[in-house]
Amino acid sequence: MFTSPFIGEIREKFTLGNEALDIPLFAIVGGTGGSGKSNLLNILNKMLGLTTDNKIPTYNELVDNDTRKDSATRQQIRYWMLNEDNVAPLLVDELPSDFFNGKGEDLIKDISNQAENQIHLTPAFICTTNAEAIGSKSEALSRRIYYLLNDRKFDSQRRAETTDRYIEVYEKINSGLFRDFVLRFSKKLMQDDLNWKHCSGNKLDFLYYTREIFKEYFEIAEIELPDFFPLSRVDDATKNNMLMWRKLYIGSPELFKEVKGEQEERNIYMIKMSELDHNFQSSRYGVDNTKPSKVYSE
């Protein structure tokens, strides 16, 4: 989030081929409902000092047009990102699950590609969604998004307590830390001898210097790095894919055949992908008619 105003400048550091596409403009916080994604976005909004509102607009609230609203919303997002000279991130809550199929996927690809040829910098788009299986989307889409999985639901029995804690945190925070971060990161951008091509898991680690700055904050506060502090680029898309297969095995173990691995020391599980489509029926009215075999194979 703190790095979002600098994404355009970081992308300019990569001029060979289409390297810039490995630095996504779209950050997606996904996961199950009730896990606090919207509250997280509201807190980050206040930390960045973007607006005085205490609620981020949802996707359905971006435009008032009642006719062809979905199309008008996509056009508005395109305009904000490609036509306005702005580096403040666009924060949007509750993207619908079907956004990442068809037109929404095309929007992400088009904006990511066109941003390379823009005269001015392109802002980042940060959103939340309850959509599942985003990590299993096409490689072209996965490359253009930064997916963070937030699947820990709050205990409904402690709703009052968690609400009080949220209000307590929200009222205390301000944009002071972000303003300091902007100064520190700007200095790094002005250093000609810095190597920006750090890699993590065969992907460009565009958040490398962000983590370095936050390490400085922990040193200043004389606090050890917590166990949850990431030491490399987070890849929740891979984690999400593993969860998908785990859920499939738990729900339909009969689809899998356990065989002994030829080189591995442990057994492996095989599945006939066509069996996934056995009970699949395409809906004339549904927006997602992707066969299960395609979802899992990707």
Which positions does each model-derived feature cover?
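Residue-level preference for the first positions of well-ordered beta-strands
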Residues: P24-I28, P89, A124
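Conserved catalytic/switch belt of AAA+ P-loop NTPases
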Residues: S97-T122
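P-loop NTPase catalytic core of nucleic-acid-dependent motor ATPases
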Residues: M1-K55
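Short secondary-structure boundary/capping segments
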Residues: L44-M47, G104-K109, K137-Y146
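Feature primarily recognizes SF3-like P-loop helicase cores of small DNA viruses
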Residues: W80-P89, I119-P123, A133-S297
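Short acidic, S/G/P-rich loop/turn micro-motifs used as interaction or catalytic elements
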Residues: G33-G36, L95-N101, A131-G135, F154-D155
